[in-house]
Amino acid sequence: MNQEIFEKVKSIVVEQLEVEEDTVTPEANFANDLGADSLDTVELVMALEEEFDIEIPDEAAENIGTVQAAVDYIEKEQAKA
């Protein structure tokens, strides 16, 4: 896992979901572990898109349930660029 991407994702998650930094682990599920509802998830995806200058289609966003999944998706998109 790219540590730089993870740290940026972690920072965004902490800010968007107002959770403690130590609760944001690669395995953390946005809904179950971090308390995100559907609106939080949409806002989180938008923040990730802005930070990493990528587009996350709705179908892809539905499959990003954990911090690790977000990092993996961003790594994949950046590799295409």
UniProtKB/Swiss-Prot annotation:
GO terms for molecular function: acyl binding; acyl carrier activity. Residues 3-78 form the Carrier domain. Keywords: Cytoplasm, Fatty acid biosynthesis, Fatty acid metabolism, Lipid biosynthesis, Lipid metabolism, Phosphopantetheine, Phosphoprotein. GO terms for biological process: lipid A biosynthetic process. The modification O-(pantetheine 4'-phosphoryl)serine is found at S38. InterPro entries: ACP, ACP-like_sf, PP-bd_ACP, Ppantetheine_attach_site. 4'-phosphopantetheine is transferred from CoA to a specific serine of apo-ACP by AcpS. This modification is essential for activity because fatty acids are bound in thioester linkage to the sulfhydryl of the prosthetic group. Belongs to the acyl carrier protein (ACP) family. This is Acyl carrier protein. It comes from Crocosphaera subtropica (strain ATCC 51142 / BH68). The lineage of its organism: Bacteria, Bacillati, Cyanobacteriota, Cyanophyceae, Oscillatoriophycideae.
